[in-house]
Amino acid sequence: MHTTYLKNLIGFESLTPQSNGAIEYIDDLLKEHGFKTEVKIFGETEQVTNLYAVYGNSKPNICFVGHVDVVPAGDPNLWHNSNPFKAHEQEGKIYGRGTVDMKGSIACFLAASLDFIKNNTDFVGSISFLLTSDEEGKAKHGTKEMLQYIYNQGHEIDFAIVGEPTCEKEIGDTIKIGRRGSINFKLAVKGLGGHVAYPQKANNPLPCLIRILNELTNIKLDKGTEFFQNSNLEVTNIDVDNNTTNVIPETATVHFNIRFNNLHSAETLAKQVEEIIKQHCQKHKLDYTLEYNSSADSFIQNPNDKIKEFATIVEKTLNIKPNFSTSGGTSDARFVKNYCPLVEFGLLSDTAHKINEYTKISDLQKLYDVYYNFLMETLNVTGSPPLLGMT
């Protein structure tokens, strides 16, 4: 059923932050199978659809956390079937926007959960879903707000699986147990514009900005840690609002981002960056404005018993020993970690957000097997049959 669920989910053009029927489809499906569900819409200008659904009323509560929203698909004519929101199956692969990020893992956990409930009437615990349509965008009214809401209603999650596409070369090779932080900067260096023939009557902000960027981009922020790669600064945009060649610009603006590990905080990095900017601007007798905001702090979890148990299930099911990692961008795991231990585990990441995003059907089966086996091991099923995928 995981392939059917995935094909159905791809059919919803759920561009962030819209559900466009995807969450409603899942809500109806889970209600049909005995889940207690609640759909909440948060936000005023951009309304975000969220779902919490739970089966069972005892502990532990194993929760799948995910998002149905997707990024734009680009030119549809570049896709195999000219329609990125109609699932296309070819040579053992399923193509469509959101296939790996992350409708495929949603489909696998749906199938695993419903099959588990059907096959095991004596299990102890609860299975739940927390889904949003606001992860790829601002992420203000999605998982973060829904977690606050369900905890205020008395719900508690004991362990979460976030279904982001984490694997690198084969299903099972990577489990995320943390993420780098992210901080965005906008720097405007303010000079005095004028004619290029009379530089003595102007103060060009660009030489100062170039020196600032040269120092910032050559800083070795750290050497990384056991689970984190080194922190990294990337310049993303430079603008002087000047298309002519004979005018010295008034202002030079740059945007840059730092992805940082747990050796730093957003505050310490902002202070370090501003000290460098201030020194150069004072030397060139220029003013500046600096804006920054952090969308996520870095975090790392010590692999506890439940995280290790999940890794053991992956290894037993797929005969591959997973690596613990913190690589990649930010995810909603940064909100979940404030409430319970978690792992991020899903499909391969290499086609996420790309034209002709796809997954192998065989990879869907592997992911389904891991999810199903974890439920079998965790929810105290007595006299259970051998785990899926094992001989």
From Swiss-Prot:
Enzyme Commission code(s) on record: 3.5.1.18
InterPro entries: ArgE/DapE_CS (IPR001261), Bact_exopeptidase_dim_dom (IPR036264), DapE_proteobac (IPR005941), Peptidase_M20 (IPR002933), Peptidase_M20_dimer (IPR011650), Peptidase_M20A (IPR050072)
Full protein name: Succinyl-diaminopimelate desuccinylase
GO biological process: diaminopimelate biosynthetic process; L-arginine biosynthetic process; lysine biosynthetic process via diaminopimelate
Gene that encodes it: dapE
Active site: D69, E135
UniProt: Zn(2+) 1 binding residues: H67, D101, E164
Presence of the UniProt keyword DNA repair in the record: no
CDD domains named among the record's database cross-references: M20_DapE_proteobac
Keyword terms of this UniProt record: Amino-acid biosynthesis, Cobalt, Diaminopimelate biosynthesis, Hydrolase, Lysine biosynthesis, Metal-binding, Zinc
Binding site for Zn(2+) 2: D101, E136, H353
Subunit description: Homodimer.
Cofactor(s) of this protein: Zn(2+); Co(2+)
Catalytic reaction annotation: N-succinyl-(2S,6S)-2,6-diaminopimelate + H2O = (2S,6S)-2,6-diaminopimelate + succinate
Pathway involvement of the protein, from the record: Amino-acid biosynthesis; L-lysine biosynthesis via DAP pathway; LL-2,6-diaminopimelate from (S)-tetrahydrodipicolinate (succinylase route): step 3/3
Disulfide bonds: none
Functional note: Catalyzes the hydrolysis of N-succinyl-L,L-diaminopimelic acid (SDAP), forming succinate and LL-2,6-diaminopimelate (DAP), an intermediate involved in the bacterial biosynthesis of lysine and meso-diaminopimelic acid, an essential component of bacterial cell walls.
Taxonomic lineage of the native organism: Bacteria, Pseudomonadati, Pseudomonadota, Alphaproteobacteria, Rickettsiales
Cofactor remark: Binds 2 Zn(2+) or Co(2+) ions per subunit.
Record family assignment: Belongs to the peptidase M20A family. DapE subfamily.
Record keyword Zinc present: yes
One Gene Ontology molecular-function label: succinyl-diaminopimelate desuccinylase activity
